[in-house]
């Protein structure tokens, strides 16, 4: 298993590229920000280092890789806040339980989200938006609606591209953890 964010991002790109040749339809990673945050924490990565890794992931999944020169149809879900069912679990990095929990990685989650959204807003070298991955953000009772930097970026991306999708867990019978069982 990957022990560093840069390696993990490369492995995810390769996985999506391979799987899109094996299965029809979108391939997805759930709780993207929650699961990547411990890698940021363990290596004490700076924001520019995190952004470089996330950029590599986004550019990688937008690289045509199969007959018909199509990029892998890919989705990611982002939790924005640590889900209750993961909060108290020991974080995993490189297949090893860390001495901290997922709930201890909120700062790193925010870095992953900021890097992802900024890269999506910036677009490619010609300023065009990225087709993939299609992001879905979980809106829960814990969503902080205040005027934060990440909220401004999230809604700027929404206004600019009409993406992401939002999963409304406030007025739903579903739980945020259900996304990992779909």
Where in the sequence are the language-model features?
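Conserved catalytic cores of very large enzyme subunits
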Residues: 1-182
């Amino acid at each position: 298993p990957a022990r560093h964010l840069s390696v993990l991002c490369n492995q995810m790109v390769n996985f999506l590229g391979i799987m899109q040749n094996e299965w029809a339809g979108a391939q997805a990673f759930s709780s993207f920000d929650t699961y990547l945050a411990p890698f940021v924490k363990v290596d004490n990565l700076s924001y520019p280092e995190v952004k470089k890794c996330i950029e590599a992931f986004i550019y990688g999944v937008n690289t045509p890789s199969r007959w018909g020169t199509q990029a892998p149809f890919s989705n990611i879900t982002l939790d924005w806040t640590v889900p209750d069912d993961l909060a108290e679990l020991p974080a995993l990095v490189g297949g090893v339980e860390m001495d901290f929990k997922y709930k201890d990685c909120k700062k790193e989650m925010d870095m992953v989200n900021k890097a992802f959204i900024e890269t999506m807003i910036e677009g490619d070298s010609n300023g065009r938006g990225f087709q993939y991955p299609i992001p879905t953000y979980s809106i829960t009772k814990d969503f902080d609606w205040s005027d934060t930097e990440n909220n401004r970026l999230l809604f700027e991306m929404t206004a600019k591209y009409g993406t992401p999708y939002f999963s409304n867990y406030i007025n739903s019978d579903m739980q945020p953890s259900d996304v990992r069982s779909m």
